[in-house]
Amino acid sequence: IAGVQGSFDDTDEVERIVENAMTGIAGIRGILVVSGGQAGVGRAFEKLNIQDRPYVIIYDQTPKNERALKSNVVDFLIDQNGYVQGYRPPHILADLLLKGREPEREFWFTDINIKTKYNL
């Protein structure tokens, strides 16, 4: 691990971080972006004219991220089923507070899917 950087969901900041890492740290084989601003990775690669780029992993299956995957800007996309994760907890809480209804079970597990351009 070369380091952990905060980008504040800012594309320009992600671009700067990737540029600095690629020019200042030898042997980078992978980049994981867990925030917004993933487009900064591709912009940094273009600016640096990188031919043999590291593997890139990003989060959230959005149309924009699917395009990045299909166009070989990134290699892997981790989908956490954000709709279910964002919908179910407030629904459970509302049922508990407004209706006094306990959740059906203690834990609700959601899927995590790893996508490549071949299984989109």
What are these language model-derived features?
Residues 4-5, 78:
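Hydrophobic residues at beta-strand termini and immediately following loops
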Residues 6-63:
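Hydrophobic alpha-helical
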Residues 36, 64, 84-88:
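Conserved active-site and cofactor/substrate-binding residues in soluble primary-metabolism enzymes
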Residues 71-83:
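Short beta-strand elements at the ligand-binding edges of bilobed clamshell
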Residues 81-120:
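Hinge/cleft segment of the Venus flytrap/periplasmic-binding protein
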Residues 62-74:
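Flexible loop/hinge segments that line or gate small-molecule binding clefts
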Residues 18-19, 71-73, 92-95:
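Short, surface-exposed amphipathic charged segments that create phosphate/polyanion-binding patches used
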